[in-house]
Amino acid sequence: MKDSNQKRNNQKTLSIVKVLGGLILVCLILFLLYLLFIPKQKESIEEKEKVETNSNVSKENTITYNGKYYQYNEHLSNFLFLGIDSREKTQTSQGQANAGQSDALFVLSWDRVEHSLTMISIPRDTMTQIETFDVSGNSLGMSTDHISLAYAFGDGSTKSCELAKTAVSNLLYQIPIQGYCALNLDGLSLLAKAVGGIPLTVPDDSLEQVDSEFKKGAKVVLDENNIETFVRYRDIEQSQSAIVRLNRQKVFLNAYETCAIKTFNKNPGFISDLYIDLQSYMVTNMGSDQFVKIMEDASSSGVKNSLTIPGEGTEGKAFDEYHVDDEKLYEMILQVFYEETE
């Protein structure tokens, strides 16, 4: 387990960009189609360091915490979904300035036996250990920075995804992540077009000054013209505006899930058509075989639990930061990924 007392080495990075969240749900829906056909994973969770004196790791993926025993649930398959903003160059002192950032991060955990889904959202300003590189691609080692920058130190493709996957896995106490999917924001309008619009209720007043249509409590339909404002905009002059936006994105995800399932039930070819349309905006190491067959199962279950990494937003020396509550996160990991045993 990571050391909760580790110093936060805040690297000053000019990294204020807009968050992309709307792309994520389509990734989730697409890959629900894949999950049931993935063989039972044999990966073992790595041993964890002590989070406190009453927690320790024993053999065979079994740990003890507060006098109770927990074993990792081998029925789980975990996938990382990233929303990438690459329209603006990522301003880092080292690394690839044009790689973009993973400004929306979600982990989907699928129990292949119970057919249940849990989605964990990770604030883009989460401070955690990431690997950094110089302009020549040489590793500079690990340092604490915004988790969104892990992707930026790669190539904007496979390497970036692997770096982000490693950072997320480490944040979640080395939980195994079997696959990833990253979507660029330029595919955002395709999502609205594919389902013919997304009706939802505006959850807060964060957009009212930008567009009077988005008053708190208003019922609106997101389309190709207004979807970007709803899922991307935030006032960068306001502290913790990324957290406010993340809450708005969750509303979008739930609404899009409903629309996608209805569209699929009317037209089973919807998923495969959308997958093809998104190819030029997507990087993934996951296959697309038998998507439609699995969608039939996923449409009856949906996402059972939706969680956010526990922590607190603070103002850093240069930019907003999200500091994880290590003890609460550890307990959440036990709840989601482990089963209590004798």
Regions found by a protein language model. Name each.
Residues 2-3, 12-16, 22, 30-342:
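Non-catalytic, solvent-exposed segments at the cell envelope interface
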